[in-house]
Amino acid sequence: MDYKEAGVDVEAGRAFVEKIRQNVESTFRPEVIGGLGGFGGYFQLPSGYRQPVLVSGTDGVGTKLKIAHSLNCHDTVGIDLVAMCVNDVLTSGAEPLFFLDYLATGKLEASQLAAVVSGIARACRDSGCTLLGGETAEMPGFYSAGEYDLAGFCVGIVEKSQLLDGSKVQIGDVAIGLASSGVHSNGFSLVRKIIDTQGLNWQDCPEILAGSSLGEVLLTPTRLYVKPVLELLRSGLDIHAMAHITGGGIPENLPRCLGKGHSVQIYCESWPVLPIFHWLAQMGSVNAEAMFNTFNMGIGFVIIVPSDLARSTINQLQSSGINAYQIGEVIAGKGEIVGLD
């Protein structure tokens, strides 16, 4: 008996690395030293920093992967994986430098996992972030046939004096909401429960989705905010704080960037809620509080700026192709989000 007979094909693993090599290397920034295959990836810090601070983040895609498995559609969840990590790192004012992925599966299906990596590489290129390395673990008996799980890890850099830690936030600042592309990568356990309870399937096309299927809409990848937000930072715009709206929605995530003594008054009518959220609320009998505490509700990222910069911030974002809205203002408080009822 050998390792292959036990369910782990080492040669297939080596062949897989060669299959994805070109895609991975297409993400390399000039700071990369060496290539794939070593015990670690090497990355030289960019020049020009006086007091560089490294910012790290890690995340996954959650049970959104169940939909990808059901539909045999694997080229977008890699985008989700990168977006969940780089958007988090971005909130500190940091530029994402490099990304690593962990991919675990019961049996290595090369074409399936190559599609996943193609999405990872695409998102890394779109974010100016190197895919520096990763791990593909074949774990027979641990995952069902055709299933896999993903985790991502990102490191970014910011000048210490420009680190956004909530200390700049002031009463009277305004919250600029950047539109999400859909459900992104949070709340999918509730999504799947609603689908199952209603006896629906991913190919169904509710009228409210204007001809698109549930699967198409729900697999829409998480929006990458790196390029437009870095453009704002590099333009010298006085950004006071930023938040990535992920699990827990606006109530959970926006207070994390505020610092002490501040709350935010949100104006719920100030942005359009996407049709998929209306559909989920109706079909699942989910009240407004639960919706806001589970989903992004159409706002995937929030930037806090002085009130006199609101219009110019929105204009710059819209010129970058991101719909943006003035969704609230900073008030005195203890980290509450007011107005979501």
Swiss-Prot record:
Its main location: cytoplasm. It is found in: Cytoplasm. One of its GO terms (molecular function) is phosphoribosylamine-glycine ligase activity. Its EC number is 6.3.3.1. One of its GO terms (biological process) is 'de novo' IMP biosynthetic process. It catalyses: 2-formamido-N(1)-(5-O-phospho-beta-D-ribosyl)acetamidine + ATP = 5-amino-1-(5-phospho-beta-D-ribosyl)imidazole + ADP + phosphate + H(+). Transmembrane segments: none annotated. Keywords: ATP-binding, Cytoplasm, Ligase, Nucleotide-binding, Purine biosynthesis. Pathway: Purine metabolism; IMP biosynthesis via de novo pathway; 5-amino-1-(5-phospho-D-ribosyl)imidazole from N(2)-formyl-N(1)-(5-phospho-D-ribosyl)glycinamide: step 2/2. It comes from Microcystis aeruginosa (strain NIES-843 / IAM M-2473). Belongs to the AIR synthase family. This is Phosphoribosylformylglycinamidine cyclo-ligase. The lineage of its organism: Bacteria, Bacillati, Cyanobacteriota, Cyanophyceae, Oscillatoriophycideae. InterPro entries: PurM-like_C_dom (IPR010918), PurM-like_C_sf (IPR036676), PurM-like_N (IPR016188), PurM-like_N_sf (IPR036921), PurM_cligase (IPR004733). The keyword Transmembrane helix does not apply. GO terms for cellular component: cytosol.
